[in-house]
């Protein structure tokens, strides 16, 4: 299966009529790992096996191969090894980690049995949380570069506007497609996500076909919940998730309330949009 997390249980219920003892269900989508644990327990009395596979690679996976993070019983995962080996990218042209040649396992091939039921989707969950943070960092950094010409703009002079000190320090008209491209070439922050960013900026520097309403499919939220349960600080991942909420207007009421309080205590009027 590779279906949205919200319909996995219904899909399993439909499939049960066609399954026999010893059959294996593979969930290759982005289910919540806690649901994986429950499903494996529910299916065990029927002698059905459940394997959770966190799959990364996006639409490019068909060409590049899929990175897979796997959770399930040892014997079952070993039985499926040839399937995972076929779908995985293999070592390819990625340089080996020094010392890795002495380590047995499949991780270099692009797939890994992470642990018992739920472990595969747990690792993929955190992978996606990290993805949120990396994407946010690129977006914020390039946003700062895009506004590096703010010193050339006309600025309102009133009590509601923070003055720009030293506007002569911000008079750079920077070409973001070229900057993203040069970063791809030997920089510390080079990555596949940066490759995709460079391609998008080259095609349309203004990103005119996007409204900037960024969805979240659940993995970021689950990652933050896990960080709270584990008492592990994750401020970058948390902020990246919260920013996605804000991008969809989820903070509009709070912002209106801030404006209302400023008006009540100081008579401050909201400035029109774009001012």
Map each language-model feature to its residues:
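Rossmann-like NAD(P)-binding element
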Residues: 1-38, 42-48, 61-74
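Short glycine-rich or small-residue beta-strand-to-loop segments that form or flank ligand, phosphate
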Residues: 24-29, 125-126, 209
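Short, acidic/small-residue loops that bind anionic groups at enzyme active sites
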Residues: 47-56, 81
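Short beta-strand and adjoining strand-loop segment in the mid-core
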Residues: 63-88, 124-132
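NAD(P)-dependent Rossmann-like dehydrogenase/reductase catalytic/cofactor-binding core
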Residues: 78, 85, 92-125, 135-275
